[in-house]
Amino acid sequence: MIKLLYPKFWQKRNIIAYILFPISWIYQFLGFLRHVFARPVILPAKVICVGNCSVGGTGKTQIVMYLANLLKTQNIDFVIVTKAYGSNLKEATIVKAEHSTLEVGDESVILAKHGTVIATKNIKQILPLIHELKPSIIIVDDFLQNPYFHKDITIVSVDRQRLFGNGFLIPAGPLREYPNRALSAADLVFLVGNNSGGIPVSLASYANKLIQAQIVASSDIDKNKNYFAFSGIGNPERFFLTLKNYGLNIVGYKIFPDHYNYLQEDLENLSLLAKTNNATLITTRKDYVKIGDSSDIIVCLDVKLSINNPNLLYEKIFKKD
């Protein structure tokens, strides 16, 4: 799997974006063909699909965690289906405690602490496992653009800072599909980020289905130390902002590509940077689960989702036919 950083031209158009724009037409046409010829499978449970219009972190994982915890409080049997990014997975697998991130993906390992998880790269492979587990609800993490299964409820996550980038499709921009289509079809739109500033103009027409959300720290971390931060996630800027809002003194940071698998050399270099700055290393839970034996010298920041309108979410999840 190709791992890329979020290039600057994805946020603000430049000559590179315009050069790549014709390739975006090909991407769009291939997506159109997928939808034309797809025959969606109807899964034997209510399906809640959480996804986004664009590449990069938009808070999907935190939304899935929130939904999982919500369903637990209602004693509803559910299963989480993940896309197994960064893994060498060949077939759909129920995630166990002994599975590594290389086997099932980092998000699968994290979400397995919140409920039963099926990791897969092909949504059609989950059918035998779903029949075995017999959940009432299936939470699908990603697969929003996948036309091969029926979705009962769709939730689109949007990052408040990046929104829809430069407005171009991959590879000229960050978009997997144009926002108007995804947002119009969505049952709920989560705007994830600092709630100050009101609703962006591009989302104003979706205010009746909009939930504003913030990702906040849920860890108890010593604020009297210096920290050197690092991450290999889709939106590292939000992680660094969360650290700042938590009141930590960040003396430096290093960004790795999304879903990055750390080498021993990387960890040694990070340790040297931290030592040089008289600091302690700090990272995200997604990175932490991939570090292995070095995790005892690194602080992990856990986060959770805080939303402004839980009643709207409850209404959609529990009252929709």
Curated annotation (Swiss-Prot):
Q: Which GO terms describe its biological process?
A: lipid A biosynthetic process; lipopolysaccharide core region biosynthetic process
| Keywords attached to this entry | ATP-binding, Kinase, Lipid A biosynthesis, Lipid biosynthesis, Lipid metabolism, Nucleotide-binding, Transferase
Q: What is this enzyme's class at the first EC digit?
A: transferase
Binding sites annotated in the UniProt record for ATP: 54-61
Give the pathway annotation: Glycolipid biosynthesis; lipid IV(A) biosynthesis; lipid IV(A) from (3R)-3-hydroxytetradecanoyl-[acyl-carrier-protein] and UDP-N-acetyl-alpha-D-glucosamine: step 6/6
Reaction(s) catalysed (UniProt annotation)? a lipid A disaccharide + ATP = a lipid IVA + ADP + H(+)
Single GO cellular component term: plasma membrane
Please provide, alphabetically and separated by semicolons, the GO molecular function terms listed in this UniProt record: ATP binding; tetraacyldisaccharide 4'-kinase activity
Q: What is its EC number?
A: 2.7.1.130
Which one Pfam family would you cite for this protein? LpxK
Report which superkingdom the organism of origin falls in: Bacteria
Q: Which PANTHER family match?
A: TETRAACYLDISACCHARIDE 4'-KINASE, TETRAACYLDISACCHARIDE 4'-KINASE, MITOCHONDRIAL-RELATED
Chain's role: Transfers the gamma-phosphate of ATP to the 4'-position of a tetraacyldisaccharide 1-phosphate intermediate (termed DS-1-P) to form tetraacyldisaccharide 1,4'-bis-phosphate (lipid IVA).
Q: Which family does it belong to?
A: Belongs to the LpxK family.
Report what the protein is called.
Tetraacyldisaccharide 4'-kinase
Its lineage opens with: Bacteria, Pseudomonadati, Pseudomonadota, Alphaproteobacteria, Rickettsiales
